[in-house]
Amino acid sequence: MNALDSHIGGVVIMGHRGTGKSTAVRALADLLPSKNRVRGCLFNCDPDQERELCDNCKMDLQKGLTLEREPFQVPVVELPLGATEDRVCGSLDLEKALTQQIKVFEPGLLARAHRGFLYIDEVNLLEDFLVDLLLDAAASGWNQVEREGISVNHPANFVLVGSGNPEEGELRPQLLDRFGLFVRVTTVSNLDDRVKIVGNRDHFERDPYTFFSKMNSAQKDLQKKLKRALKRVTSVKVSQEVIRKIAELCVRLQVDGHRGELTISRAARALAAWKGHESVNESDVRRVTVMSLQHRLRKDPLEQFESSDQIKKILDQVFPLVTK
């Protein structure tokens, strides 16, 4: 859904070790269609969005130059836990400074992730200063760097994706609230599914080329479906009745702010586009509500029920299941 609408706000995936969280995120890169950027731009600037150009591209426009375009693969950039501030935000290119006596800015991970995905494995173990950097960039959509006499301002709009094991620590509330969706992944308990997983992994390790050939057709089908959904998503309609019920749901659950309603409506629209529908129905809303709200509810230490159970209870009242 985030691949269809980046405004959903990303996703955090929490679950036990070895459940395929990281594998699923890294596999996303091969599904994403290419985009256009300004030729040679280190910040992946969109030539059709003049208000979101880096300083270099703005200077070229002011000089009357035409911003040529080139296709590029949508990036899925991984942010390691031990990354430094310079690695994330960018820094002075020391090699050129020493050998050529010129000051050149070397883009960081935020620049590489612009118009793509920024992935953090074990996000709940992320250092506090990195969390603050991400919160600033996520809030403004820009990264401003002041280094050794260099001042650089460039766009940093990315979809934030995190994964982690809840047993290793909790995620800071400020960062958790920035994620649009929250997904729990559990270990597969069905015997046939476990056998299939082991068989696929064994096949891949023994003969990866044959395995890729076997899965190529299904992969191509997913790519085509994603492209069709991308063309359709902006035209999918959400009726006032559905929006009113979404708002009622959030009011009854005492959700703070309005990110809950916005996330549900955007995620439901993306899901409807994926299904090939022209408008959002109540089934779409039911499908995305728990993952949109379960990390936003106020926590009561005396409450014995899971947040997801509380959401489902109110959801059944506002959006009752229609049985035929």
Spans of features found by a protein language model:
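Conserved AAA+ ATPase core "coupling" helix
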Residues: 87-89, 171-230
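Contiguous, well-ordered alpha-helical segments that form the cores/surfaces of helical PPI scaffolds
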Residues: 1-4, 263-273
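Conserved ASCE/P-loop NTPase catalytic core
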Residues: 1-189
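Conserved AAA+ ATPase small/helical "lid" subdomain
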Residues: 209-264
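Non-catalytic, well-ordered alpha-helical scaffold segments
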Residues: 22, 132, 173, 177, ...
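Phosphate/oxyanion-binding loops and surfaces in catalytic or ligand/nucleic-acid-binding neighborhoods
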Residues: 31, 35, 201-205, 291-295
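C-terminal engagement/docking regions of AAA+ P-loop ATPases
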Residues: 17, 23, 247-259, 270-324
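Conserved hydrophobic residue
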Residues: 9, 143, 203, 274, ...
